[in-house]
Amino acid sequence: MAIKIVGDPLPNIPWEDRPADARGVVWRSARNPIIPRDLLPTSNSIFNSAVVPYKGAFAGVFRCDDTARNMQLHAGRSQDGITWELEPERIHFACKDTDCDCAEVNRWVYGYDPRVVWIEDRYYVTWCNWFHGPTIGVGYTYDFETFYQLENAYLPF
């Protein structure tokens, strides 16, 4: 069976062939954990579910739980997709929309399970958010340095 990738080539993706004894559709890297749970001085665990190619390297948004298990979102970068540098401070979302109440929309309680996708001219970020109850947070970035939050996708009522 031939492998067909739909999209731009990713010649620098850190690919590993399926181990001979692997039976599943997906297999884990032999180098796991890629990001150690305590990479940041305050982190108890780090989850890397939102990595994308960015300017010939990789960038992403990561859930980092501190030792009190507060769930925060942090930006990170890697040249090779294996060795990562994460921002020590959580993402603080800005608000460009003058029609929304930025203080209310950006009130942070928790964030987890982020995803990142490129659409047109920016990277959109979605995550499990809290806004008067569980909801889906939506934001975007152009550069993985400044992040803008939009209205939540689903209100919890």
Regions found by a protein language model. Name each.
Residues D113:
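Beta-strand-rich binding-surface signature
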Residues M1-V109, V117-F157:
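Beta-rich carbohydrate-recognition and catalytic domains
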